[in-house]
């Protein structure tokens, strides 16, 4: 079984002054392991399932057209889960705690806007 097929385009919301809150949060507030895990989740989960993540542990509708991507796994676990036919053993959880939320909006049928996010582990 190959890697999942991307069905949705992910775009960062950009304000009138050019700020991209989700991108800024990812680049300035997250540790390297958190960024790698989030990048994997965006590629392997959100870009494949879009708003359909809300039917899984990875998403939840929050109202008014918004939903959140919910992440509590590291990059290695996400990659392993995306290739279940892999002969490799399940990776051990790293010591880095991952508990991230990214707020999203489905724009049209194939675009997901990334609006902002927070580290629930640091800011419960």
Regions found by a protein language model. Give the residues of each.
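Basic, Lys/Arg-enriched alpha-helical interface segments
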Residues: 1-98, 108, 119-124
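Active-site beta-strand-loop-beta-strand hairpin of nuclease catalytic cores
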Residues: 106-114
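Hydrophobic/aromatic beta-strand elements that line small-molecule binding cavities or substrate pockets
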Residues: 101-104
């Amino acid at each position: 079984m190959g890697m999942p097929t991307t069905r949705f385009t992910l775009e960062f919301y950009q304000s009138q002054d050019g700020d991209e809150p989700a991108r800024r949060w990812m680049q300035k507030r997250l540790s390297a392991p958190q960024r790698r895990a989030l990048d994997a989740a965006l590629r392997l989960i959100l870009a494949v399932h879009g708003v359909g993540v809300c039917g899984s542990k990875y998403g939840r509708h929050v109202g008014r057209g918004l939903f959140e991507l919910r992440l509590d796994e590291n990059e290695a676990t996400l990659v392993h889960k995306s290739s279940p036919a892999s002969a490799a053993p399940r990776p051990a959880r790293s010591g880095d705690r991952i508990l991230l939320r990214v707020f999203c909006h489905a724009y049209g049928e194939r675009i997901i806007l990334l609006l902002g996010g927070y580290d629930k582990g640091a800011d419960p």
